[in-house]
Amino acid sequence: MFKFFSGFGDSNEKEIRALEPLVDKINQLESSFSALSDEALKAKTAEFKERLKETFETTASAILKDIAGTTAELEEAQKTADNSKQSRLKAKLESLNKDLSVKENAALNAILPEAFAAVREASRRTIGLRHYDVQLIGGMVLHHGKIAEMRTGEGKTLVATLPLYLNSLLGKGVHLVTVNDYLARRDAYWMGPVYHALGVSVSSIYPMQTPTEELPSRLFDPTYTSETPNDPWMHFRPISRQEAYKADITYGTSTEFGFDYLRDNLRPDLAQCVQREMNYAIVDEIDNLLIDEARTPLIISAPDTEAGKLYEVFARLAPRLAAGKDYEINEKDRNAELTEDGWANVEKLLSREGVMKGSSLYDPQNAPLIRHLRNALSAKEFYKKDHQYVVKENEVIIIDEFTGRMMLGRRYSEGLHQAIEAKEHVKIQQESKTYATVTIQNLFRMYRKLCGMTGTAATEAEEFSKIYKLEVVIIPTNKPAIREDYGDQIYKDQSAKFKAVVNEINEMRNLGRPVLVGTVSIENSEMLSNMLKRQGIEHKVLNAKQHEKEAQVVAEAGKPGAVTVATNMAGRGVDILLGGKEPPKDDDKAYSQWQVHHQQVLEAGGLHVIGTERHESRRIDNQLRGRSGRQGDPGSSRFYVALDDDIMRRFGSERIQGIMEWAGMDENTPIENGLVSRTLENAQKRVEGYHFDVRKHLVEYDDVVNKHREVIYAERRKILLGADLKSNILDMIREEIMTQTAEHTQGYDSSEWNLEGLVTHIGGIFALPAEINAEALAKLSQEEITELLTRTAEELYQKKEAEIGAGSMRLLERIIMLHTLDSLWVEHLTIMENLRREIGLQAFAQRDPLIAYKNEGHVRFQELLETIKHDVVHNIYRVNIQIQHQTESATAKAASRPVQQQKPLPAAPAAAIPGVSAKAATQPAAPAAKEVGRNDPCPCGSGKKYKKCCGK
């Protein structure tokens, strides 16, 4: 059936061949589904669901019963300190859930041919698109939890409808993850009629603009019409966040899915949570998210106070330090290390500024200054305006190195963004305190079934397999690919290279071919634009500064003779159609004109792509090439390289320069041969291998905090679900009494016991009756003391409950547990961040930093658990409910009005790579009752001022 397997490899071909019988079966069903009425086609969904239900009742009922029993048993075990039993039950539950997934997939496989046939027919009737056979193959690969590599223009958006519909039949919700908000709306709206024809609901998650926004999402509903004139989304009905997640299929970005997960784990009430179980997700452009964005965790934080003075001091200091004299630059690892002369110079300058304490920068009290120094040097050497960021409206905005887009709202973390703001003399914003965080890697590893689509995944197949356990399957094209990829041309310097680029642009343009030129930075795109203007060559520029015009520029990029200069992969997700954007067929004049242009470009040779520099990743280069030659169209591509390009300067340019000098070539004569191309490719492979190791290391480090997060979030959810907190808290009290009694009554001689200390400590937990004092306890044995204090604690607990009522006591238990858990978890995250930064020093002691981090992290986590128990025990008797309306904790407020951040973490602490953070501060929600003053007593009853307690 499929003839285009050349170069795919035997295993990939076998994978495709194994799916061919299913394609044949779907094709055989086509005529019978075409004969169905619209109502009968929609009724197929109810039929499929009923068949799945019947299958589960016969094949999975025992597993479901076992899961329920094991879950109940685990909840009981968690009330005790039997860790071995808990571990055994968790392992059993994980195994049972895997067995259930196998049963579910088997049931879905049984109805796959009919379900795919139904989607194909619904698509043909509603949007006029019929799935090709290769698209059916792509849908099956996605359903099986693998990555489908499909070339540009092969219809990934349409392919996704097949597995999304099939897996939505389980009723657990499925997610389609896009690379930006526009595509989340466009794809949900475009495919909406297909799902609606099948009786399946589809929603799109919109970014929340304010914390009080009630309807930050949309549901496709043909019966609804927007009141906004010329609304491109006229059938998108506004709905709440919870309703969006209750839809059968939900489209959104990784950022929105991730922040909703974090926000749900900060909410004070389960009824406020929006997400369901993480069931099945298809990630569009999966390489962009799980490879390029892998080092970017999602963080919810709030401003932390730190004066901007130090940033300004170091912004003045950095230009006074000379590279090569005061510090050495390591471009490969992107860091700068001070020389001995540099240390002396810095100490002298800082003393003059009056910010250094003592006589040496090595003194412990000067440790924060070293971080400021590193950030200032990084801002000076590695973060250049119009390369890594732009300054717009007195604000530093990050540029996405992979797409060239402005990353509005994102900020570098760990003080780097502030250092750049100081360098650029714009307002320095406050640093942040982390309330909740999860890496992109761990977020998507939570899904029971994960898959993805992209045009370029094969080069990263090893990483997908090792980190995510995802197999890459290359899907054959619907038509043979005929694009011609020319060899690289290498020049001695940038000037000669860009002159040659301009000449080739002019040559192709004169042939009537559209030209797409990819640059690596805004600066290069604007420099090339100026060169083209001087030559009188009409062109469009697409970079972060013009991102608003992106859709329009991409739509016109395929016209005859059109020249488009774009940073990297700006416009990814939108096809460049030869002849320009295809107009509606009912517009005779416009459509006729488009056909002429389309044919003209085809005959001229199609779209020509020029890369002005090799990227560190072959995959990014392939993405640029992939803009040309879609759906069997003609096209070509060529890369131009200079010896002073970043990748050439960092890897292997000396060898190539030696070849050029040996050949006696001048600067305007290019070299083009296999040796140079292989050298370049080997350099890219080395960089890819380095970044793979970085990301693999990141997973290993983040898994430490991830295990902590799983435990804390599970405990938090149990509290919200109404777990028996009373027995848990009483157990904590008994344990505290036993521990303190044992500690204060050591030794056989009771005269040596510290009973005064014991009475003081227990009196700090609850008010002891007058008759229980050191003198009375001296007459008792250790066991009798423990028994007396425990009995007294239980009686006082019951007395408190009788005074305020059982319902109020349960509420008080929940408030104290949540407040304690949340506040201490925030502190623990800060401790782990600091530990991660410092642990790299273990390498100097010949210790593996990762092992040291795991060991230290375990100690810190045990301390966290003990501190939680301690604080709960010491607060439960002292705190009273004084008002009807529960006041939100600081953590709950962070959930409603987060400062959202994203930052790449170093793979290992020694790497010292400052990260990226995203900030989208919003206004606080209006209070339900009279606002509490900062100096008023806290309404939670702690006795502290509001600003020192819940108002932090």
Curated annotation (Swiss-Prot):
Keywords: ATP-binding, Cell membrane, Cytoplasm, Membrane, Metal-binding, Nucleotide-binding, Protein transport, Translocase, Translocation, Transport, Zinc
InterPro entries referenced in this protein's UniProt entry, alphabetically: Helicase_ATP-bd, Helicase_C-like, P-loop_NTPase, SEC_C_motif, SecA, SecA_CS, SecA_DEAD, SecA_motor_DEAD
Pfam families for this protein: P-loop_SecA (PF21090), SEC-C (PF02810), SecA_DEAD (PF07517), SecA_PP_bind (PF01043), SecA_SW (PF07516)
PROSITE patterns: SECA (PS01312), SECA_MOTOR_DEAD (PS51196)
GO terms for biological process, alphabetical: intracellular protein transmembrane transport; protein import; protein targeting; protein transport by the Sec complex
Necessary cofactors: Zn(2+)
E.C. number(s) listed in UniProt: 7.4.2.8
GO molecular function: ATP binding; metal ion binding; protein-exporting ATPase activity
Predominant subcellular localization, coarse grouping: membrane
Recorded coiled-coil stretches: none
CDD domains, per the entry: DEXDc_SecA (cd17928), SF2_C_secA (cd18803)
SUPFAM superfamilies, A to Z: Helical scaffold and wing domains of SecA, P-loop containing nucleoside triphosphate hydrolases, Pre-protein crosslinking domain of SecA
Entry-linked SMART domains: SecA_DEAD, SecA_PP_bind
Cofactor binding annotation: May bind 1 zinc ion per subunit.
Enzyme's top EC category: translocase
Region (Disordered): 916-952
Positions contributing to ATP binding: 135, 153-157, 575
Catalytic reaction annotation: ATP + H2O + cellular proteinSide 1 = ADP + phosphate + cellular proteinSide 2
Membrane association type: Peripheral membrane protein
Cited PANTHER family: CHLOROPLAST PROTEIN-TRANSPORTING ATPASE, SECA INNER MEMBRANE COMPONENT OF SEC PROTEIN SECRETION SYSTEM
Summary of the function given for this chain in its UniProt record: Part of the Sec protein translocase complex. Interacts with the SecYEG preprotein conducting channel. Has a central role in coupling the hydrolysis of ATP to the transfer of proteins into and across the cell membrane, serving as an ATP-driven molecular motor driving the stepwise translocation of polypeptide chains across the membrane.
Similarity-based family: Belongs to the SecA family.
Full protein name: Protein translocase subunit SecA
Source organism per UniProt: Dehalococcoides mccartyi (strain ATCC BAA-2266 / KCTC 15142 / 195)
